[in-house]
């Protein structure tokens, strides 16, 4: 067994960021529904593109980030002009990226920043327990053998390409370019030696 010590669980690449000090407003499902329904709110999915492709909240902005390290650039290029004009609401799988992202936005001078309490998985659990409407569309990528889960937290049937690590839908699995252990439609093609 080999243990590797890392400075950050989810790397954003921003020195001095302290999400334990201050973060956005934790929004439980009822507040979350009110916030994302507000036309003065920009809803941002802080996950990576391959996760967003599986499911998201309707109307959420896909920042088109390949990794979480791309998020500060997205903020600078797209959110800075909205500072002081719009509320920002963010969500991620379990809440870790939102903690960091909301802390970063507050450090950058954004005032009204919300984050989905417990992330998407917490939202699924809480809406089911409380009998609330679940506004999510699609499935949710998870970082374990299930690959993705449905709103009731059951495995969705997605598979993971063992070559490029891209999640695959049933349609992707039926594609002739997908040969498990060799390639999928996302990584199929000529390779360099």
Regions found by a protein language model. Name each.
Residues 1-25, 48-88, 96-193:
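Rhodanese-like catalytic fold shared by cysteine-dependent sulfurtransferases
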Residues 23-28, 35-36:
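A conserved helix-loop-strand patch within extracytoplasmic ligand-binding domains
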Residues 44-45:
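Structural scaffold elements adjacent to functional motifs in cytosolic proteins
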Residues 39:
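Glycine-rich active-site/cofactor-binding loop and its immediate structural neighborhood
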Residues 91:
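Phosphate-binding active sites in nucleotide-utilizing proteins
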């Amino acid at each position: 067994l080999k243990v590797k010590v890392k400075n950050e669980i989810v790397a954003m690449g921003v020195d001095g960021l302290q999400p334990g000090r201050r973060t956005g407003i934790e929004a439980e499902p009822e507040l979350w529904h009110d916030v994302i329904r507000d036309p003065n709110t920009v809803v941002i999915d802080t996950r990576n593109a391959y996760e967003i492709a599986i499911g998201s909240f309707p109307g959420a902005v896909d920042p088109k980030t390949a990794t979480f390290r791309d998020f500060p650039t997205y903020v600078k290029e797209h959110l800075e002009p909205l500072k002081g004009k719009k509320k920002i609401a963010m969500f991620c799988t379990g809440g870790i990226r939102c903690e960091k992202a909301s802390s970063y936005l507050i450090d950058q001078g954004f005032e009204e920043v919300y984050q989905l309490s417990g992330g998407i998985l917490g939202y699924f659990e809480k809406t089911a327990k409380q009998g609330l409407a679940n506004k999510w569309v699609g499935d949710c990528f998870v970082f374990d053998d299930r690959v993705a889960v449905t709103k009731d937290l059951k495995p969705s049937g997605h598979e993971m390409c063992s070559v490029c690590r891209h999640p695959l839908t049933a349609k992707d699995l039926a594609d002739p370019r997908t040969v498990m252990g060799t390639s999928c439609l996302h990584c199929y093609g000529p390779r360099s030696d």
